[in-house]
Amino acid sequence: MISAQAVKELRERTGAGMMDCKKALMEANGDMEKAIDILREKGLAAAAKKAGRVANEGLVDAYIHSGGRIGVLVEVNCETDFVANTDEFKNFVKEICMQIAAANPKYISREDVPQAVLEKEREILKAQALNEGKPQNVVDRIVEGRIEKFYKENCLLEQEYIRDPEKTVKDLLNETIAKLGENIVIRRFVRFERGEGIETSSNE
């Protein structure tokens, strides 16, 4: 039986996708170093090595949800215009647009969440835990657990991939990096929803 902790460690060490890590560990009978070799042989451990390389080519793409209710504009960068023009890269960018439209992330990664937002969220979560009657000595642990949930809901890279909840968007990104052999960066996005921020008034 392969533990979730082993899969997580292998993923952190290689940058490969979660399912690829699990398969490699099963193939290696749980041997971490052997699993790393398996991933390297398959070219799936390359993502981490490419992360430091400059990515200034790429695409700006748009997605409009049927009915014109939601629109997304996203910029995704890669290293060369050759890769930017491949169907694989274009499909990846389109998938990211659709993910943003469906899952409504606020940030790309947890590092992008402003400290003030985190502090406010912690205050609210702490008050909730205390109001639920949780003991003071476990409140901090509960709050940190809920902050992790906040990251998974609001940070694009940590969200479950809409087409395969077994993967995160980060897994999808790393798999695409491994396939295309270049660093890929989701640079920025904006999401519009019709009527968002407009106060509606009802006539009695």
Swiss-Prot record:
Involved in Mg(2+) ion dislocation from EF-Tu as annotated region, ranges: 80-83
Any one GO CC term of the record: cytoplasm
GO-annotated molecular function: translation elongation factor activity
The keyword Protein biosynthesis appears for this protein: yes
CDD domains on file: UBA_EF-Ts (cd14275)
Alphabetic keyword roster: Cytoplasm, Elongation factor, Protein biosynthesis
Subcellular localization: Cytoplasm
SUPFAM superfamilies hit by this protein: Elongation factor Ts (EF-Ts), dimerisation domain, UBA-like
Pfam families in alphabetical order: EF_TS
Annotated function: Associates with the EF-Tu.GDP complex and induces the exchange of GDP to GTP. It remains bound to the aminoacyl-tRNA.EF-Tu.GTP complex up to the GTP hydrolysis stage on the ribosome.
Family: Belongs to the EF-Ts family.
NCBIfam families cross-referenced by the UniProt entry: tsf
UniProt name for this protein: Elongation factor Ts
Gene: tsf
